[in-house]
Structure formats: structure tokens, C-alpha cells
Amino acid sequence: MNIFVFVKQIPVISDIRMNHQTFTVDRSSAGSMMNPADLHAVEAALSLKSVLGGSVTVLTMGDESCDVQLREAIAMGADTAVRITDDAYTGADTLVTAKVLTAAVRRLGPADCIFTGHASLDGATGQT
């Protein structure tokens, strides 16, 4: 069974500062962590793997700072971690992110099951 999990890096909430000129989160001011809902998705995928066998592949989109969360997923028991990165994706909206992750699964698949968190704490759109 090929199980995929999408994870997102988010800023540590207690460290967030706002840029008062652009009214955006200053991500450079905060550490990062795996989105908690995505962490639960990884745990659920690993539970399914323990029952049915197969492999768990964790995917994220971002720069090298995302590698910490991917290593965390590997330490939890994921078999493979994939970071998709390209300067063209910098600042990508949720639709672009969803399309890129979908294309990655199609290339790596076939996918028998895909897990995601229900929403991220930093955007809460629940669209990817």
C-alpha cells in the first residue's frame, strides 16, 4: 500500500511577530514546527501502515528550512520524505500548492491513500 501524507511547516505561534508595514507575519522572527494537524495525519498514516503494510511517503513544498519537519516524520517511521522546491513557487497560493502536490503524488504514485491535516494553524484555509 502506497500511503502519502502532506505536511506543512508553520511558524511557532509564541514567536510570531507581525510586519506592521505589510500586515503579514514576519516568518523570519519565529522558529518553525510541523503543523499539528499534519502531525496527526502522519501518525494516522503510520497506524494504517502498521496494520496493512506498505510505505509512507511524506511530502512538503518549501525551502530547505522544511527539512526539519521531514526529518521529524522520518524519525516517527515514515519511509520516504520529499521536499518540492523551486523559486517559481515562492509565495504560492493554496491552489498552486495543491496542484504541485497532486502532480508529485501522480509522479511518485500510485497512491492508495493520501492523508492531510484538516487545516494549518497559520492560514487555516483547509484548501490544500
Q: Model segments located where?
A:
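N-terminal glycine-rich FAD/FM-binding segment characteristic of electron-transfer flavoproteins
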Residues: M1-T128
